[in-house]
UniProtKB/Swiss-Prot annotation:
Pfam families: Alpha-amylase, CBM_20, TIG. Ca(2+) 1 binds at residues 52, 54, 57-58, 76, 78. Monomer. Its cofactor is Ca(2+). It comes from Bacillus sp. (strain 1-1). This is Cyclomaltodextrin glucanotransferase. Binds 2 calcium ions per subunit.
């Protein structure tokens, strides 16, 4: 009998061991590192359209559409549906390590006069309650625990720009933009006794200023310079951080002041830091320097519309070629300080689906392969792996009806998501173009000695590739996609030259070597902004298991935890400014520096600075400069601006909302700069002002 028990135990242990070996590689994803998504694959879900796991919480009446016949109405998707698709392996087998879900807060219940509803989650009513049609707080907690136990982070959408549709002259329009604080009415649009909203009409998108301080369409626009609204929104996001969210996608960042949003990010990073990225929409071919400035200075990353629009032009619409794509890769690497933290995509809820029919499936597969091997944090829009089609909103938000794990796209995502976890070149690497013409793009990602080489042929004919060079070591390399896109094997010689080969029509091949560094290399730092005492995480390779040191320029920081690939430290007590980070191992080996971490001068508040009677000639603008890093440290080249003078105040009064250290004695002056860079300083003594310890403020002076 004992022999039989021993035999059964052996069989059982062998079976358990086999199951453990069979777990997908993505289970290695680190859900505790909430500030680094470089190796992750995000899956964007419009919660109402993904899966209806609990029909009992569906709405009734005019706002619900049975079988989703009316795409403007609720269709039943909920958090239970997402939980089910984690538990049945659909999302984990796909290789997903982060979910971006619709804003979870309570939305308006009323039907818009045009037949629209708040199914999308962007018409907030109460940020401290759940949308009951998605689920209650118990459901949300189960979603978080289920995701985390399966190696998946959860990102929430967040709309601090506006509440819901409203009209100045009609209090019965939808719900009058009303906003509540855990059930208590804060205010509404037509009876705005606390001045919570802007009342400047709708934006015509004619300028950056106009888009910030006027309503986006008919949405009631928050006055973020109002202390009540400022504190309510910051309390609200901290409420959800305490619920365990791992990331935030901020809606409509182009339509809020950078100053207020920087103060928001400071609040988040001082409370519970998580990876945060914003939506700054760019059209096809559009390049906006203000977009790059925001990504570099606000404290958050952005959805990379330059990447998304360009890959669509090359592979979907065929209006651009690989020269254009390579130019985008090259230019954005210079324009974004942390290009690997920008969030890339091929389609989303605000543009038509990439797939347009079965004849385009190959292009979808190819685009996904490029997305998942390029720099940035890749995002898959729900259903793209099933070749869901649809034009613009709402056709691009159809319910997902099939969960087929055998589609080519599903398999490609799964394989490359796994490779992102195991080869640091995809998460952290630089990009080098190796072979290029209108139809062919061969590019190499490199981090230390880890290399991924990807080749794409978007033409309808086979192409002979000669004179290709690579950093891959000598040897034969098989296609990591296992010929799912007709890839081939290559032979690399000792000098890096690749033997000539045929790159098949409409094919993608991926070749790689993973060779983790034994000397320290920093791959990512998150967040890249914080005040003294904040916790940041340094990710990379070769740090060693024994503690060394992390330097901000030459100043050591307090170590919280240390491993070979991840270090957590506290920002040292240094003056506000920009510092280069480096890791020094216990063996006294120093890493290359990671550039320009911004140390804030303290807790941040948003202050509106304004000046009256500042007349200028055409081509001359007004700026502000002062005695802290947030005001440029008296460097005219780093002055804040150009200031605004059209909406909240009109010329010759100028104004600008700026994030400054709280409770700080500030000195500052205004300067005039012309288009040639000539500067005229405001005369007299430095102006002085003490910023508030919390909330917001406005300080106006005369020129």
């Amino acid at each position: 009998m004992n022999d039989l028990n021993d035999f059964l135990k052996t069989i059982l242990l062998s079976f358990i061991f086999f199951l453990l070996l069979s777990l997908p590689t993505v289970a290695e994803a680190d859900v505790t590192n909430k500030v680094n998504y470089s190796k992750d694959v995000i899956y964007q879900i419009v919660t109402d359209r993904f899966s209806d796991g609990n029909p009992g919480n569906n709405p009734s009446g005019a706002i619900f559409s049975q079988n989703c016949i009316d795409l403007h109405k609720y269709c039943g998707g909920d958090w239970q549906g997402i939980i089910d698709k984690i538990n049945d392996g659909y999302l984990t087998d796909l290789g997903i390590t982060a979910l971006w879900i619709s804003q979870p807060v309570e939305n308006v219940y009323a039907l818009h006069p045009s037949g629209y509803t708040s199914y999308h989650g962007y018409w907030a009513r109460d940020y401290k309650k759940t949308n009951p049609y998605y689920g209650n707080f118990d459901d949300f907690d189960r979603l978080m625990s289920t995701a985390h136990s399966n190696g998946i982070k959860v990102i929430m959408d967040f709309t601090p720009n506006h509440s819901s549709p409203a009209l100045e002259t009609n209090p019965n329009y939808v719900e009058n933009g009303a906003i509540y604080d855990n059930g208590a009415l804060l205010g509404n649009y037509s009876n705005d006794q606390q001045n919570l909203f802007h009342h400047n009409g709708g934006t015509d998108f004619s300028s950056y200023e106009d888009s910030i301080y006027r309503n986006l369409y008919d949405l009631a626009d928050y006055d973020l310079n109002n202390t009540v609204m400022d504190q309510y929104l910051k309390e609200s996001i901290k409420f959800w951080l305490d619920k365990g969210i791992d990331g935030i996608r901020v809606d409509a960042v182009k339509h809020m002041s950078e100053g207020w949003q920087t103060s928001l990010m400071s609040e988040i990073y001082s409370h519970k830091p998580v990876f945060t990225f914003g939506e700054w929409f760019l059209g096809s071919g559009e390049v906006d320097p203000q977009n790059h400035h925001f990504a570099n200075e606000s404290g958050m990353s952005l959805l990379d519309f330059q990447f998304g629009q360009t890959i669509r032009n090359v592979l979907k619409d065929r209006t651009s070629n690989w020269y254009d794509f390579n130019e985008m890769i090259t230019s954005t690497e210079k324009e974004y300080n942390e290009v690997i933290d920008q969030v890339t995509f091929i389609d989303n809820h605000d543009m038509s689906r990439f797939s347009v029919g079965s004849s385009s499936n190959r292009q979808t597969d190819m685009a996904l392969a490029v997305l998942l091997t390029s720099r940035g944090v890749p995002t898959i829009y729900y259903g793209t792996e099933q070749y869901v089609t649809g034009g613009n909103d709402p056709e691009n938000r159809k319910p997902l009806k099939t969960f087929d794990r055998s589609t080519n796209s599903y398999q490609i995502i799964s394989k490359l998501a796994s490779l992102r976890q195991t080869n640091s070149a995809l998460g952290y690497g630089t990009t080098t173009e190796r072979w290029l013409n209108e139809d062919i793009y061969i590019y190499e990602r490199t981090f230390g000695n880890s290399i991924v080489l990807t080749a794409v042929n978007s033409s309808n004919s086979n192409q002979t590739i000669t004179n290709l060079n690579t950093s891959l070591p000598q040897g034969n390399y098989t296609d990591e996609l296992q010929q799912r896109l007709d890839g081939n094997t290559i032979t690399v010689n000792a000098n890096g030259a690749v033997n000539s080969f045929q790159l098949r029509a409409n094919s993608v091949a991926v070749w790689q070597v993973s060779n983790p560094s034994t000397s320290p290399l920093i791959g990512q730092v998150g967040p890249m902004m914080g005040k003294a005492g904040n916790t940041i995480t340094v990710s990379g390779e070769g740090f060693g298991d024994e503690r060394g040191s992390v330097l901000f320029d030459s100043t050591s920081s307090e170590i919280i935890s240390w491993s070979n690939t991840k270090i957590s430290v506290k920002v040292p007590n240094v003056a506000g400014g920009y510092y280069d980070l480096s890791v020094v191992t216990a063996a006294n080996i120093k890493s290359p520096t990671y550039k320009e971490f911004e140390v804030l001068s303290g807790n941040q508040v948003s202050v509106r600075f304004g000046v009256n009677n500042a007349t200028t000639s055409p081509g001359t603008n007004l700026y502000i400069v002062g005695n802290v890093n947030e005001l440029g440290n008296w460097d005219a080249d780093k002055a804040i601006g150009p200031m605004f003078n059209q909406v909240m105040y009109q010329y010759p009064t100028w104004y600008y909302d700026i994030s400054v250290p709280a409770g700080k004695n500030l000195e500052y002056k205004y300067i005039k700069k012309d288009q040639n860079g000539n500067v005229v300083w405001q005369s007299g003594n430095n102006r002085t002002y003490t910023s508030p310890t919390t909330g917001t403020d406005t300080v106006m002076i005369n020129w």
